[in-house]
């Protein structure tokens, strides 16, 4: 399930998704920094911040 428009989402969409995720992580200081950073992109995708096409890419990453 790969699309030609995925690479674009991987760069721009990923960056935009990292912004809201970071703010949310600030509130969740219970999780370790390493785990939070690794789950940042995944959480963003699961939350629906990124389009479905990006969701697949996030899972792979």
UniProtKB/Swiss-Prot annotation:
Annotated region (Disordered), positions in chain: 1-40
Ranges annotated as biased composition (Basic and acidic residues): 9-25
Protein name, entry field: Uncharacterized protein T28D9.11
């Amino acid at each position: 399930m790969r699309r030609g428009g995925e690479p674009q989402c991987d760069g721009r969409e990923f960056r935009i998704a990292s912004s809201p995720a970071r703010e949310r992580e600030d509130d969740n200081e219970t999780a370790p920094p390493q785990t939070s950073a690794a789950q940042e992109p995944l959480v963003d995708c699961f939350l629906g911040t990124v389009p479905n096409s990006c969701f697949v890419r996030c899972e792979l990453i």
